[in-house]
Amino acid sequence: MVLLRVLILLLSWAAGLGGQYGNPLNKYIRHYEGLSYDVDSLHQKHQRAKRAVSHEDQFLRLNFHAHGRHFNLRMKRDTSLFSDEFRVETSNKVLDYDTSHIYTGHIYGEEGSFSHGSVIDGRFEGFIQTHGGTFYIEPAERYIKDRTLPFHSVIYHEDDINYPHKYGPQGGCADHSVFERMRKYQMTGVEEVTQTPQEKHANNGPELLRKKRTTSAEKNTCQLYIQTDHLFFKYYGTREAVIAQISSHVKAIDTIYQTTDFSGIRNISFMVKRIRINTTADEKDPTNPFRFPNIGVEKFLELNSEQNHDDYCLAYVFTDRDFDDGVLGLAWVGAPSGSSGGICEKSKLYSDGKKKSLNTGIITVQNYGSHVPPKVSHITFAHEVGHNFGSPHDSGTECTPGESKNLGQKENGNYIMYARATSGDKLNNNKFSLCSIRNISQVLEKKRNNCFVESGQPICGNGMVEQGEQCDCGYSDQCKDECCYDANQPEGKKCRLKPEKECSPSQGPCCTAQCKFKSKTEKCRDDSDCAKEGICNGITALCPASDPKPNFTDCNRHTQVCINGQCAGSICEKYGLEECTCASSDGKDDKELCHVCCMKKMEPLTCASTGSEKWKKHFLGRTITLQPGSPCNDFRGYCDVFMRCRLVDADGPLARLKKAIFSPELYENIAEWIVAYWWAVLLMGIALIMLMAGFIKICSVHTPSSNPKLPPPKPLPGTLKRRRPPQTIQPPQRQRPRESYQMGHMRR
C-alpha cells in the first residue's frame, strides 16, 4: 500500500514537470515542454534594443534548448505590421503607441527559418518556423493556474496540436444557411450615385490607367482596423499582451498571403492602421456596442458592420466568446461585382434601413469551453479574410482532398477555405486551393486599387539582409563590419559588399570578421536527434542544411525513428512493420490500448502490442507505450498518465438524445416493423381504443354536464377515499367520547 502511494506521488510529480515528454497542456495540445531562461536578462536586452545604442544592441538574442534541439534566436523590432499612421484607442483616449515589444527574426544560421513574437516582462511569446515545423511559445500561467512551476513559459510543436473538430460536423465557420442569409442581404445594398474622379478617369480611359499602373509601384497592402472587446482583454490581461496577439495573427496571415500567387497578383500583405481596445472598464460603457455578454455570432458581426469603416481595407473584432455550434469566425464574402461586401467595401444603405460597412469580420479564441491554440486561431483568421477577399467555402473533389477516398490525397488534408476549422498540421492546411485562388484573383483585380496601399520596400540599415541587398550592417554609427558598406553610403553602394570582400558576418555564421568564408571543417549548428551538426561549406556565409542521420535512427526517446532527417516515423517502421491501433475486443487486455502496436503491412489481423510474444524478436519483450494524451481504442478515447484508455463522449447526452429521436434510421426501422407486423399494430390500435373508451366511461361520472336529466358529477377526492356506511347524525355526546369511538370501530 505504501509502495502504491509512493508510485502515485511520483507519477503526479512527473506529470507536473516541464520538459518531460508526454505532457498534455490541454485537450487540444498533446505535449509541451517548459522554458525557464533568465527573464531579467532578456528584459535588459529588450531595453537596450529599444534604445539601439549600437549595432549589436539592435538585435535581441535569445538562446534556449527544447524538443531535442537548440534555438538561437536573433530578432529585431518589427515595424512592418504597423502603418505610419498607427494609433491605439482605449477608453476614449488615442495614443501614439510604442510597439517596440514586437519582434521578428530567425534562427541564427538556419536558412529559411523565421520567428515572430513579443517580449513582455522579459518573456518571449510567439512562433518559430523551422525546417522541422513550427513551434509555439506562450506564458505557462495561461494554461496552468494556481500551481508553483519550475518554468515560466511553455513551448510545443504544431504536430502536437490535436484539434478534434477539424473534420467533425461542428467547429469553424457558420453553416450554409447563415451564409445564404448574408448573401441575400448583401444584394440589397444601394449604390451611391456620385462618381469619384478616379472612377470617371477609369471609365474614360482604361488603357491609360492600365499603362500608369504598370509604371507605378504596385498597391498590394491591405490596411486593417482591429478592435477587441472586454472579454478578449480580460483573458490576456494587459494592453501589451492584446497588441501582441493582434500582431501574431496579422503576421501569420501576412506570411500565408505573401507566398501565394493569385493568378499573377503576388506579395499581398497586411498592415495594422488602427487598434481599439475595449478594456474591462468599458464593459458598462453605453457607447460600447460589444458590452453585452450574450451576443450571437451574426449579431456580433452586425454590431461591427454598423460602424463606418470607409478608411480601412478590412475591420475585424477579436473576442473571447463561445459561440453556438463551435463557430470560430464569421465574415462577409466579397465578390468582383453585383454584390456588396468584402475588401474595400464602403458604407452604404441596405434593405433594413441601416447604413453598414460590410468589409468586416469577427474572430473568437474560444471553442466549446476551451481556448483554441494560436495555430488554429491563425488559420481561422486567414480563412475569414479569405471570405472577405472573395472566396466561398471549398467544394468539389478538386478542392477538398481531405474528403477524398484516396488515402494519399486525404493525408494532405484540406485547404484554408474548407468549411470546418483545421488544426494546421496537414500539408494543405496553410494553402489556398485552386478554387479559392481563382475567386480571390478576380476580386483583387477589381477592387484592390480602391483601398490597397503600396507596400514597404526593403530597408537598408535595419540589420537584416533582404531582397536586393548583399549585406546589411546598419548605419554608420552602428556598423562595425569591415566587409559591408553602411546605410549612409549613396545609392548603388550602401548594403553592398566592399571590393575584394567575400562575405559579411551579417549574411550568416559562416563568414569571419575578416570577410572570408569559414573553412569546411567549422561547425555552425549543433546536431539534433535526426540531423548531424551543421558544417560550413566554404563557399557561402549561410549555414548549410545539416546532413540527416541514417533513416530509422531512434529518436524522441526511442518512440519514433528518423525519416529523411525528421523525427517522423513510427518505431514499427524500423522492422518493416506498420503502426496500428490496439482496439478493445473480446479477450484483449485493455492495458494494451495504450501500447504502441504494430502489424504486418496490409494485414490488420496481425496488429499486436510491441510487448507481445508476436513481436518479441524485434522489441525483445520491451513494451513501448503511447504518450499521455494520445488517442487510443480506435480514436474512441485518450491515454492518461497511468496508461489507461479513458473513453471520451464527444457528443454529450443531449446530442445523443437528439440524434436518437430525430435519426432518419429510426423512422425507417419503425416503418419496416409496421409492414412486417401489421397484425400487432392492429391489435395495439384496438387495445388503445378500448382503453380510451374505458377511461371515458369511468371518468364520465365526474364530468359536469348542462343536461338536467343527468345526475350531478361526483367529486373525485370523495371517490378515491375508502367509503364508510352512512351513519345517523346524532348530537355529540361530550360525556362519552370513548364509547362513540368504540362503536364506530366495531361498525367498521
UniProtKB/Swiss-Prot annotation:
Limits of the Peptidase M12B domain: 220-456
Domain of life: Eukaryota
Propeptide segments, given as residue ranges: 19-213
TM ranges: 673-693
Cysteine pairings via disulfide bonds: C222-C313, C344-C451, C399-C435, C460-C495, C471-C484, C473-C479, C483-C515, C503-C511, C510-C536, C524-C543, C530-C562, C555-C567, C572-C598, C580-C607, C582-C597, C594-C639, C632-C645
Region feature Interaction with AP2A1, AP2A2 and AP2M1, mapped onto this chain: 734-748
Tissues of expression: Expressed in chondrocytes.
Localization in the cell: Cell membrane; Golgi apparatus membrane; Cytoplasmic vesicle, Clathrin-coated vesicle; Cell projection, Axon
Catalytic activity: Endopeptidase of broad specificity
InterPro entries: ADAM10_ADAM17 (IPR034025), ADAM10_Cys-rich (IPR049038), ADAM_Metalloproteinase (IPR051489), Disintegrin_dom (IPR001762), Disintegrin_dom_sf (IPR036436), MetalloPept_cat_dom_sf (IPR024079), Peptidase_M12B (IPR001590)
Sequence motif SH3-binding, location on chain: 708-715, 722-728
UniProt-annotated site: Cleavage, residues: R213, T214
Signal peptide: 1-18
GO biological process per UniProt: adherens junction organization; cochlea development; constitutive protein ectodomain proteolysis; epidermal growth factor receptor ligand maturation; in utero embryonic development; marginal zone B cell differentiation; membrane protein ectodomain proteolysis; monocyte activation
SUPFAM superfamilies in the cross-refs: Blood coagulation inhibitor (disintegrin), Metalloproteases ('zincins'), catalytic domain
Topology versus the membrane: Single-pass type I membrane protein
Activation/inhibition comment: Catalytically inactive when the propeptide is intact and associated with the mature enzyme. The disintegrin and cysteine-rich regions modulate access of substrates to exerts an inhibitory effect on the cleavage of ADAM10 substrates.
Quaternary structure (record): Forms a ternary EFNA5-EPHA3-ADAM10 complex mediating EFNA5 extracellular domain shedding by ADAM10 which regulates the EFNA5-EPHA3 complex internalization and function, the cleavage occurs in trans, with ADAM10 and its substrate being on the membranes of opposing cells. Interacts with the clathrin adapter AP2 complex subunits AP2A1, AP2A2, AP2B1, and AP2M1; this interaction facilitates ADAM10 endocytosis from the plasma membrane during long-term potentiation in hippocampal neurons.
Function: Transmembrane metalloprotease which mediates the ectodomain shedding of a myriad of transmembrane proteins, including adhesion proteins, growth factor precursors and cytokines being essential for development and tissue homeostasis. Associates with six members of the tetraspanin superfamily TspanC8 which regulate its exit from the endoplasmic reticulum and its substrate selectivity. Cleaves the membrane-bound precursor of TNF-alpha at '76-Ala-|-Val-77' to its mature soluble form. Responsible for the proteolytical release of soluble JAM3 from endothelial cells surface.
Name of the protein described by the UniProt record: Disintegrin and metalloproteinase domain-containing protein 10
Organism field: Sus scrofa
